[in-house]
Amino acid sequence: MSSSTQVGLKEQLHPLIRDLATGIEATWQRWLNLEPYAAMPADLGYIEGKLEGERLQIENRCYQSREFRKLHLELARVGNNLDILHCVLFPRTTFDLPMFGADLVGGRGQISAAIVDLSPTTIARELSNDYIAGLTALPNPTFQGLRELPTWGDIFSSFCLFIRPGSPEEEAAFLDRALGFLQVHCQQAAAATALTDPEAIATVLEQQRYYCEQQRRNDKTRRVLEKAFGDDWADRYMTTMLFDLPSD
């Protein structure tokens, strides 16, 4: 297993993944004051391994800001057969904000799964009126290949979009909608006021923990990591990098 710096992984990935990764980081830079993520595990910035004889590469980019304890963008590639983007923004528990999440999975030139959502891990357990207004104002194209959410998907909002893009036009429309979600989120976060009530903060903490616990039930992700690196490493990666629980 290698943890050396890798240059150019993004450029090897499917164009939609490249474009979404670039757009995500540009949106962060525009709306937020980013700092390096203080709790980044030193050995998990770049990882290499083998999965069924194919080279597995994982690159993690993590930041923090006033509003978010962690902004995580993961890019991964398995040989020439599988490209992955995973992104989650974890609000600080002193901010009553939803969780932005986006995932792309592709292989052999096709995107098989594309999902984006703002999950309402908030005190009211639903998106605020400001979020609803912002999301409703976005262009909302029709997609043909809608996919069914997983059984643990009660964390997702009614705005969740989960598709298998059927054309370059649908890929472009998904990109625009995902970045629209993110811009609404960053705008709302930048304008948000920190919570001071201990009970409210405790409720946000409880909701974030539930979100992370549900996401950890994604058996597909865990199985890939276990095959490549073993059970213990996979568990550590799931709990310290992908869906670490807030402590504050």
UniProtKB/Swiss-Prot annotation:
* Disulfide-bond pairs as recorded: none
**This protein's record includes keyword Endoplasmic reticulum:** no
Signal peptide annotation: none
Per the UniProt record, one Pfam family is Fe_bilin_red
Which HAMAP family does the record match to this protein?
Answer: Ferredoxin_bilin_red
- According to UniProt, the name of this protein is Phycocyanobilin:ferredoxin oxidoreductase
Record EC number? 1.3.7.5
Lineage, top-rank taxon, reads Bacteria
User: PANTHER family recorded for this chain?
Assistant: PHYTOCHROMOBILIN:FERREDOXIN OXIDOREDUCTASE, CHLOROPLASTIC (PTHR34557:SF1)
